[in-house]
Amino acid sequence: MSSFVADKIVMDGLTYDDVLLIPAYSEVLPKQVELKTKFSRNIELNVPFVTAAMDTVTEASMAIAIAREGGIGVIHKNMTIEEQARQVAIVKRAENGMIYDPVTIRRGSTVKDALDMMHDYHIGGIPVVDDENHLVGIVTNRDLRFERHMDKKIDEVMTSENLVTTHIQTDLVAAASILQENKIEKLPVVDNENRLVGLITYKDITKAKDKPMACKDAKGRLRVAAGVGVTVDTLDRAKALVEAGADAIVIDTAHGHSKGVVEKLKQVKAAFPQVDVVVGNVATGEAAKYLVENGADGVKVGIGPGSICTTRVVAGVGVPQLSAVYDVYSALKGTGVPLIADGGLRYSGDVVKALAAGGSCVMIGSLVAGTEESPGDTIIFNGRKFKSYRGMGSLEAMEQKNGSKDRYFQGDTKDAKKLVPEGIAGRVPYKGTVQEVIYQLIGGLRSGMGYCGAATIENLHNAKFARITNAGVLESHPHDITITS
């Protein structure tokens, strides 16, 4: 037995419940700490939260909500290429400093065409242009609200006289004044020849004021990432996502330390060198270094820690999450490549521990599953509200036409009975809005950083841990009382 331990046991594996952070001298209050961090080599977040690329967690609504709070969402890939690209486009159009490629409608189109476009793009107004992109009018939902004749030409209902416009040099402060003075909500931006080059909306200006911490690109649009797999259509999917405006591509697999994943990484980086590519999942420093050496701009860490993941019991494989995060952090020091701690987080205290162990940010699934913005309908069960939540390795998720079986290297399996699930499906209590959940998580994170004397997440990496026993875990939670509130 001793030789087995000496030869085969190479590390002790610890997870979040095995440790507590040791309080340290502090000169910062929780409200003073800085939460800025990185998602990938070139993408900065204002809070260290990333929503998971899961079909019961992140679609456009979730990605918009988390970006407004300062994080970023990863749109899942359990859908057609066209639908995933559409989801990305919805996020990129949700807010803008100035919309540089506004949705337009051609002169001669019908009321039905305009209504369809408003529905598809979730917008309330469309500039009308001629064949040479000259602005000839604008049509809004107010113009169409009581219109019964769907085949009527847009020219007959649009506003074309006394159209208020501005030029490309106008900043948002000046634009806000123009909108207010003229009591309008949309301000077309034109060049010297009256060609449409952009659109500024009152709603976008208001949102920018209401959410100053929102995670945005250089054009004032919300940031969003999107997942791809290791399949024959990886490059086609990545191309569509990049064209739709995705800020990062996430190559999402169960085992990132593999030949096929690295080959896809090289192909995606070669095709789209301007876009950051995050790769996962891995659980060792060796794996992370291998990915970074081959071009990864971010590394996702976690094999089997998620609440809906069964990889560790089905395959017997994994590394307890705290140890995995620290091993990868140690390996990536000095590379400038961030690591994302993915999975195993149940409390805000776990977030603090994950970041203290070396995480740049955390990926959350169960913590935001069940929110208003997560995909799926709210169901009533025994008088309480729930929403569905499932692992991408669950049989449900893998059975779909555009399912996730390739994530678990079972893409060629045609018969559902031959699939080997590495996840489960279930339901979680309804949690309210993402804003409410993130507010509580940020509060716990700020408090933990204050206790550790860490003014920044980078400072938090210097915090020390105490290993605790099962008795310590019990002592850490409320005990010897009936909780009433």
Task: Give residue spans per PLM region.
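Catalytic cores of alpha/beta
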Residues: 61-64, 236-244, 277, 283-301, ...
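Bateman/CBS regulatory modules and CBS-like beta-alpha motifs in cytosolic regions of diverse proteins
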Residues: 31-46, 52-54, 83-121, 128-130, ...
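Active-site-adjacent beta->alpha loops and helix N-cap segments on the catalytic face
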Residues: 31, 80-89, 147-151, 195-215, ...
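Terminal amphipathic helices with adjacent charged low-complexity linkers/tails
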Residues: 77-91, 128, 132-148, 179, ...
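Alpha/beta catalytic cores of nucleotide-metabolism and tRNA/nucleoside-modifying enzymes
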Residues: 1-25, 105-106, 167, 227, ...
